[in-house]
Design a protein with these regions (language model features):
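Metal-dependent nucleotidyl/phosphoryl-transfer cores and adjacent nucleic-acid-binding surfaces
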Residues: 1-155
């Protein structure tokens, strides 16, 4: 099924609407430019982001059950010094446990969805409460701000 409306930006889809289901998809990254781990701090969300060995996510490892993948599989070189310290502490605690790829992948994805859901709901509530404005009526943060400016939404 194809969407009735969509907005494409490069190879990404920013917005999709399915009339039959009254279902709208908006790219939340167009509103919250921070990584998920930072949104957790921004909106005081208790859900932990967790760690996942993205470099280990290869077709041949999809059914892997065994020792935890090496530290390099988690991309520690891409972490901030503070995040790296936290990661190393976590890794020291789990490295001798059994790593079940499917179980860990599912857990990591569910935590991402939970964290993003809480962040965007909090973001929405802040604007609805302070500006009487629903950000999800817009496709991007700049389009919302433009509307606020021209409608002179009270500050």
């Amino acid at each position: 099924m194809l969407p009735d409306k969509y907005i494409q930006q490069g190879s990404g889809i920013t917005y999709m609407y399915f009339r039959k289901f009254k279902l709208r998809f908006v790219d939340t990254y167009k509103f919250c430019l921070s990584p998920l781990a930072d949104l957790r701090k921004t909106y005081d969300i208790k859900t932990e982001k967790g760690y996942f060995p993205h470099h280990f996510n290869l077709p041949e490892n999809q059914n892997y059950v065994g020792s935890y993948p090496s530290i390099e599989m988690y991309g520690p070189k891409n972490m901030s010094p503070k995040a790296n310290v936290e990661f190393n502490k976590w890794y020291a605690e789990v490295k001798n446990d059994v790593f079940d790829f499917k179980k860990e992948f599912k857990k990591y994805c569910l935590l991402d969805v939970e964290l993003l859901s809480k962040a965007i709901l909090t973001f929405r509530q802040i604007f609805q409460t302070s500006k009487d404005l629903d950000p999800w009526r817009y496709v991007t943060l700049p389009s919302m701000c433009k509307d606020m400016f021209f409608k002179k939404v009270p500050s």
